[in-house]
Curated annotation (Swiss-Prot):
The gene is ung. PANTHER family: URACIL-DNA GLYCOSYLASE (PTHR11264:SF0). Gene3D superfamilies: Uracil-DNA glycosylase-like domain. Keywords: Cytoplasm, DNA damage, DNA repair, Hydrolase. CDD domains: UDG-F1-like. One of its GO terms (biological process) is base-excision repair, AP site formation via deaminated base removal. PROSITE patterns: U_DNA_GLYCOSYLASE. GO terms for cellular component: cytoplasm. Belongs to the uracil-DNA glycosylase (UDG) superfamily. UNG family. This is Uracil-DNA glycosylase. It comes from Francisella tularensis subsp. novicida (strain U112). Signal peptide: none annotated.
Length: 220
């Protein structure tokens, strides 16, 4: 099974057509939607299903200009690193001595190694967080999470915060490793995310399962 198989099947479903109709209508009415149309499915572009080793779930895309480009927590180069990603870098630096905090938040290197950076809602209206949370995207992304669980083995799922942790019911814990903590947001990072050791535990598990570990360092 490939992403193309899953997308082809879901695109035939009424809910998916409603999503596309909604986005087209909003754009026609002058609404600005992020990420750009060609970037909405970038998580699927950069991480092939065959190569997928890790899933990190986000909620919805960044809602300011020049930030979102289709990968959860990632921003385009030349943009300030968002606070949640700064805390992700802090945890990496705390737990992995050789990790060097980069000067950007562009996470494509992770995605190409098999880290699937999936927002559960794939679009957002400019400057309106969670504005597209009820248009049907979660039906699609829940299906994607379930398909990964059913068709893969030994995937590491990182579930940060209450929204992501609700997706635990979609994952077969007998086939995969589920790592849970609070969200890396400044509001909650100190209540469990900082110190969680997820990136170390992830690589230990991948090595145990005879898989290539993730190099969390990002080229500057």
């Amino acid at each position: 099974m490939t992403w193309s198989d899953i997308l082809a099947e879901e695109k035939q479903q009424p809910y998916f057509k409603q999503i596309l109709d909604f986005l087209a209508c909003e754009s026609a009415n002058g609404k600005v939607i992020f990420p750009a149309k060609e970037n909405i499915f970038n998580a699927f572009k950069y991480t092939e299903l065959d190569n997928l080793k890790v899933v990190i779930l986000g909620q919805d895309p960044y809602h300011n200009y020049n930030q979102a480009h289709g990968l959860a927590f990632s921003v385009q180069k030349g943009v300030d690193i968002p606070p949640s990603l700064q805390n992700i870098y802090k945890e990496l630096a705390r737990s992995i001595p050789e990790f060097k905090i980069p000067n950007h938040g562009y996470l494509v290197d992770w995605a190409k190694q098999g880290v699937f950076l999936l927002n559960t809602t794939l679009t957002v209206e400019a400057h309106k967080a969670n504005s597209h949370k009820d248009i049907g995207w979660e039906t699609f992304t829940d299906t994607v999470i379930s398909k990964i669980s059913e068709n893969k083995h030994n995937v590491v799922f990182m579930l940060w915060g209450s929204h992501a942790r609700k997706k635990k019911v979609l994952i077969d814990s007998s086939r995969h490793l589920i790592l849970e903590s609070t969200h890396p947001s400044p509001l909650s990072a100190h209540r469990g995310f900082l110190g969680c050791n997820h990136f170390v535990d992830c690589n230990k598990y991948l090595i145990e399962k005879k898989s290539q570990k993730i190099d969390w360092n990002l080229l500057c």
